[in-house]
């Protein structure tokens, strides 16, 4: 188990913190025109029967009896929280070794596909267990309330956090890191697994002092695949999604595209495809043009550009395979990647990209949690009216039914709501609907904004400071990295803190994506302040 016996803290990574909706969806694949699942018809029938009989309280998810997890482990503090449950630090009673325990509440498994997703995630983790640079599952347990997945504890935090704390950053270091990431992809693909949600925050370190102790986590969207199999479900994170995924016809080549995006971010600090809205990002991805000329691409070698072009080839059949990437001259051992420091603007950009909108997202969560039943009863009725199949989720076709409530929402607000909710899954559940609607609902907006601001400004000074953000992150078990960047992104008068007017401007701005102007202005401030380098 390597370093699993050591103490450590990390954010919500184990619990899919950045997959606001994706946890619920995965794992349908299509061969030709025939849709299949990972489970037999009889298995699906038994699951459906279990749901009808009250799965949430009594029925088994794993399909076999397990010991009581609390007889073997002591569950400690919360490490993260996600849609289906929470992740805790746990200590094995017999050895004293520490692990991470992902607890998935059965009450949150509302349909057959939810149960299948949990089973498949566990199957894939067992299938890949013991492979280098992939988080190791120790065991699974089930009781009447929850399923518990015990895995090794990645105590070193996020890989990208470590990168951004370095004072010197070079192409050679980027090549070493992307070699690890593509090596993980090669391992997955050779074992018949497609990850489908690779992104920087899904790579953690076992040991903060060892940059090569990288572990890939979060297989909640991963699937088994066969050669030639075609997948049609749109999943993933907007900046990293491959064009063929958006076109609903893809295979494992999509993971290579994602790695190419990560490499671009490593070298420049910004993603290759971005816009002010998610739909705008998707348009850029489908267009496929890569910027190698602007000042966002300073002093990068031709060999690195060549590799990125081949990893971000818009045609999957012509895109490099994982083993071909590892043989590229820029990335292989003793390759041509230079050890010369990258342009000094890269690390501030990388930090800014990692921290973008984190304060806004946290603030929206705080507002949503504090809404009274009276404030959300109208939205609840809207959701129920759209949820015609009583599945506790609605599709985007159903979401368009909001137009019948035009007295509350304008057409432009409905479009914004759809973009805010859309993480490429094409569905949204109740909690997600509320959190997305919070930023658009004009009713008593001032009251909600003041409540969120006050959550941070507990001493009533009228300002949000780095220290206050740190305390808020501790309260919510979030990583407190790059707090200065969170301030910097919102601080308009450069006084190092956020006043209420600046906070309101941030919250009311329609910046679901990361626009270049936002980064450019923030970057200029960052360079003036010359900070030392998630």
UniProtKB/Swiss-Prot annotation:
| Name of the protein in its database record | Calcium-dependent protein kinase 23
Compartmental location: Membrane
User: Could you say which residues bind ATP here?
Assistant: 79-87, 102
Q: Which residues bind Ca(2+) 4?
A: 491, 493, 495, 497, 502
Keywords (A to Z) from UniProt? ATP-binding, Calcium, Kinase, Lipoprotein, Membrane, Metal-binding, Myristate, Nucleotide-binding, Phosphoprotein, Repeat, Serine/threonine-protein kinase, Transferase
All copies of the EF-hand domain together span 374-408, 409-443, 444-479, 480-513
- Primary location: membrane
What this protein catalyses is: L-seryl-[protein] + ATP = O-phospho-L-seryl-[protein] + ADP + H(+); L-threonyl-[protein] + ATP = O-phospho-L-threonyl-[protein] + ADP + H(+)
Its biological purpose: May play a role in signal transduction pathways that involve calcium as a second messenger. Involved in the activation of sucrose synthase 2 (SUS2) in developing seeds.
The text the record gives for the protein's domains is: There are 3 contiguous domains conserved in the CDPK subfamily: a kinase domain, an autoinhibitory (junction) domain and a calmodulin-like domain. The autoinhibitory domain (337-367) inactivates kinase activity under calcium-free conditions.
- Binding residues annotated for Ca(2+) 1, in chain numbering: 387, 398
- MF annotations from Gene Ontology: ATP binding; calcium ion binding; calcium-dependent protein serine/threonine kinase activity; calcium/calmodulin-dependent protein kinase activity; calmodulin binding; protein serine kinase activity
Q: How does it sit in the membrane?
A: Lipid-anchor
Lipid anchor (N-myristoyl glycine) at which residues?
A: 2
Positions binding Ca(2+) 3 in this chain are 457, 459, 461, 468
Cross-referenced CDD domains: EFh, STKc_CAMK
Lineage of the species this protein comes from: Eukaryota, Viridiplantae, Streptophyta, Embryophyta, Tracheophyta
* Annotated GO biological process: intracellular signal transduction
InterPro entries from the xrefs? CDPK_Ser/Thr_kinases, EF-hand-dom_pair, EF_Hand_1_Ca_BS, EF_hand_dom, Kinase-like_dom_sf, Prot_kinase_dom, Protein_kinase_ATP_BS, Ser/Thr_kinase_AS
Q: Where is this region: Autoinhibitory domain?
A: 337-367
Active-site residue numbers: 197 (proton acceptor)
**Sites where the protein binds Ca(2+) 2:** 423, 425, 427, 432
Factors inducing expression: By UV-C.
């Amino acid at each position: 188990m390597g370093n699993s016996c050591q103490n450590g803290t990390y954010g919500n990574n184990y619990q899919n913190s950045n997959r606001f909706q994706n946890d619920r969806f995965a794992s349908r694949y299509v061969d030709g025109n025939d849709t299949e699942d990972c489970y037999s018809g009889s298995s699906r029938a038994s699951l459906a029967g279990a749901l009808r009989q009250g799965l949430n309280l009594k029925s088994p998810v794993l399909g076999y009896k397990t010991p009581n997890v609390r007889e073997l482990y002591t569950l400690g503090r919360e490490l993260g929280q996600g849609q289906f449950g929470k992740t805790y630090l746990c200590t094995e009673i017999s050895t004293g070794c520490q692990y991470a325990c992902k607890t998935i509440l059965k009450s949150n498994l509302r349909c057959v596909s939810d149960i299948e997703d949990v089973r498949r995630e566990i199957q894939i983790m067992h299938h890949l267990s013991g492979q280098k640079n992939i988080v190791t599952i120790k065991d699974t347990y089930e009781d009447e309330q929850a399923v518990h997945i015990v895995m090794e504890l990645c105590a070193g935090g996020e890989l990208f956090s470590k990168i951004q704390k370095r004072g010197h950053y070079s192409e050679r270091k980027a090549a070493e890191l992307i070699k690890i990431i593509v090596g993980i992809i090669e391992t997955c693909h050779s074992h018949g697994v497609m990850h489908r949600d690779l992104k920087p925050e899904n790579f953690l370190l076992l040991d903060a002092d060892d940059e090569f102790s990288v572990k890939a986590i979060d297989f909640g969207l991963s699937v088994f695949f066969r050669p030639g199999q075609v997948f049609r479900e749109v999943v993933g994170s907007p900046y990293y999604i491959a064009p063929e995924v958006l076109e609903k016809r893809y295979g494992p080549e999509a993971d290579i595209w994602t790695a190419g995006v990560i490499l671009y971010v490593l070298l420049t600090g910004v993603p290759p495809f971005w816009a002010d809205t998610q739909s705008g990002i998707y348009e850029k991805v489908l267009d496929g043009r890569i910027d190698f000329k602007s000042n966002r691409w300073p002093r990068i070698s031709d060999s690195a550009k060549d590799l990125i072009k081949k990893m971000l080839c818009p045609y999957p059949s012509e895109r490099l395979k994982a083993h071909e990437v590892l043989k590229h001259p820029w990335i292989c051992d003793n390759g041509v990647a230079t050890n010369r420091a990258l342009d000094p603007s890269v690390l501030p950009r990388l930090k800014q990209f990692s921290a973008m909108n984190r304060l806004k997202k946290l603030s929206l969560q705080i507002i949503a949690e504090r809404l009274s039943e009276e404030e959300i009863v109208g939205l609840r009725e809207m959701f129920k009216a759209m949820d015609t199949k009583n599945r506790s989720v609605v599709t985007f076709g159903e979401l368009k039914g909001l137009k019948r409530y035009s007295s509350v929402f304008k057409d432009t607000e409905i479009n914004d709501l759809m973009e805010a909710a859309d993480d490429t899954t094409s569905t949204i559940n109740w909690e997600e609907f509320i959190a997305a609607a919070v930023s658009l609902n004009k009713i008593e907006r001032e009251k909600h904004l003041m409540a969120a601001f006050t959550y941070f400004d507990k001493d009533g000074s009228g300002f949000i400071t780095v220290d206050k953000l740190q305390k808020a992150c501790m309260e919510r078990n979030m990583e407190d990295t790059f707090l200065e960047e969170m301030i910097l992104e919102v601080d308009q008068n450069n006084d190092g803190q956020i006043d209420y007017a600046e906070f309101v401007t941030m919250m009311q701005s329609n910046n679901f994506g990361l626009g270049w102007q936002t980064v450019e202005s923030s970057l200029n401030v960052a360079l003036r302040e010359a900070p030392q380098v998630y």
